[in-house]
Amino acid sequence: MRRLTMTRPDDWHLHLRDGAAMKAVLPHTVRQFARAIIMPNLKPPVRSVADAASYRERILAAVPEGQQFEPLMTLYLTDNTSPEEIVAAKASQFVKAVKYYPAGATTNSDLGVTDLRRCDGVLAAMEQVDMPLLLHGEVTDGDIDVFDREKVFIEKHLIPLITRFPKLRVVFEHITTADAVKFVLSANNNVAATITPQHLLFSRNILFTGGIRPHFYCLPILKREDHRLALLQAATSGNPKFFLGTDSAPHSRYSKESSCGCAGCYSALHALELYAEAFESVDAIDQLEGFASFHGPDFYQLPRNTEQITLTKSPWRIPDELPFPESGLVPLRAGEEITWQLGE
């Protein structure tokens, strides 16, 4: 196949940042996606409906003229989030989910939850009003190997969570292991998962090919090849429990290429083309539309998009660097050739 026309997709996990950084990256997402679930881990984080409303207005003001884009807002769950805030979030109609970060697990997560059980009152309110919970599914215990954090999170926190709240809609975000795939498949239909392009395309070997490769470093970290293959099988299976979430995370070149570099891969520029390469690698390009355009809105109980986009088999070179405050932004696979191209 040299040409694929499909329904315009959505990104169900996106970091836009704020201010000048947001203005630099938002056009990339708007070009590819109609909607996106916007992560709340700003400084300070988006903790209230008022915070979300203000951030939403800043995003809409930065959308390029003549373009359409709908930001789907989230709240940052803390130990102090109240059930009343959840009710207000649901009533707002623009807050679509609440995000759980284990304290210290990733970028700007210092104010995250210290113990998920402390949030049972809030989770009960979320279950009652049908507000989805988005999970960064890793433990942060210092004695747990970084490559095992997702598996331990499932056993220690996730299984007990869905047992306590069986009607709570849960998105296990950016899954990275065969263990996570198995869990999602075994759970009820209120549990789904997003998968990033980097976790479909690369194993952890890429981090050390020819030296340290900081622009492939993200959290959860890339895993072994057998885990990558399990994710690819899940994404291309047609199962509606799995859908697109880039976790595109812009960091300046300086903040990535340092003695203590930030976690995050930037893929918003070319995410759909990256997913197309992954799906084509296992002869499943026909399953891309479901994964990218249908499964997400169906889970979130939103209408599917109606606009069409076209991908063409037309190789192009990913830029070495993109404009970004401070020191530029290096996209995933910078300088390499990619085989699919999204039409204008």
Swiss-Prot record:
The modification N6-carboxylysine is found at residue 99. The gene is pyrC. Its EC number is 3.5.2.3. The keyword Hydrolase applies. The keyword Kinase does not apply. Zn(2+) 2 binds at residues 99, 136, 174. GO terms for biological process: 'de novo' pyrimidine nucleobase biosynthetic process; 'de novo' UMP biosynthetic process. Substrate binds at residues 15-17, 41, 136, 219, 251, 263. It comes from Microcystis aeruginosa (strain NIES-843 / IAM M-2473). The lineage of its organism: Bacteria, Bacillati, Cyanobacteriota, Cyanophyceae, Oscillatoriophycideae. Its cofactor is Zn(2+). Pathway: Pyrimidine metabolism; UMP biosynthesis via de novo pathway; (S)-dihydroorotate from bicarbonate: step 3/3. Belongs to the metallo-dependent hydrolases superfamily. DHOase family. Class II DHOase subfamily. Binds 2 Zn(2+) ions per subunit. This is Dihydroorotase. The active site is at 247. GO terms for cellular component: cytosol. One of its GO terms (molecular function) is dihydroorotase activity. It catalyses: (S)-dihydroorotate + H2O = N-carbamoyl-L-aspartate + H(+). Keywords: Hydrolase, Metal-binding, Pyrimidine biosynthesis, Zinc. Homodimer. Zn(2+) 1 binds at residues 13, 15, 99, 247. It holds the Pfam family Amidohydro_1. Catalyzes the reversible cyclization of carbamoyl aspartate to dihydroorotate.
